[in-house]
A protein has these predicted regions:
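Secondary-structure boundary/capping signal
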Residues: 21-22, 56-57, 136
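Single conserved hydrophobic/aromatic residue that forms the stacking wall/gate
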Residues: 132-139
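Flexible, glycine-rich terminal cap/loop adjacent to redox cofactors
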Residues: 18, 29, 34-45, 50-131
């Protein structure tokens, strides 16, 4: 899977042996399928949230209007963000498209630091950056 995940698991084992609470949250570990287009996700799926009885809202957007994706000739793809309906906290990020193996890090950061969709929407990045900004605006 991921070398970084294996490293974190090793640290978690050492923490547990030392009587500490392991720091790793497996919900925040990204999954990536290196195909063309790439597929990546982190956090909960809609099915998991429904099974847990969590009320959520969903935002989706595509790469069709993204200048960088258009310049790359890879404007096909979509991003879906799931957020708690009451708190707006991001619960899951799912995507397919160009370089989403890198873009998923934005979702990992949001989950790790309990960000809301509004928190992510307020971040300003360079214009031609592939990101989930438009998706959280849809929430």
């Amino acid at each position: 899977m991921l070398a970084h995940k294996a490293s974190d698991e090793g640290v978690a084992v050492a923490e547990r042996i030392a009587g500490q609470k392991p720091h790793i949250d497996f919900n925040n570990v990204p999954f990536v399928i290196y195909t063309d287009p790439e597929i990546a996700w982190v956090g909960k799926t809609e099915e998991q949230l429904k099974a847990e009885g969590v009320e959520y809202k969903k935002g989706t957007s595509g790469f069709g209007a993204n200048g960088r994706a258009l310049a790359m000739g890879k404007a096909k793809g979509t991003v879906k963000v799931l957020a708690d309906a009451k708190t707006d906290r991001i619960l899951g990020v799912h995507m397919i498209g160009p370089v989403v193996s890198e873009l998923v890090t934005e979702g990992v950061t949001a989950l790790e630091f309990f960000a809301s969709s509004e928190d992510i929407a307020r971040i300003t990045v360079s214009y031609t950056h592939l990101r989930a900004h438009e998706t959280v605006l849809d929430l």
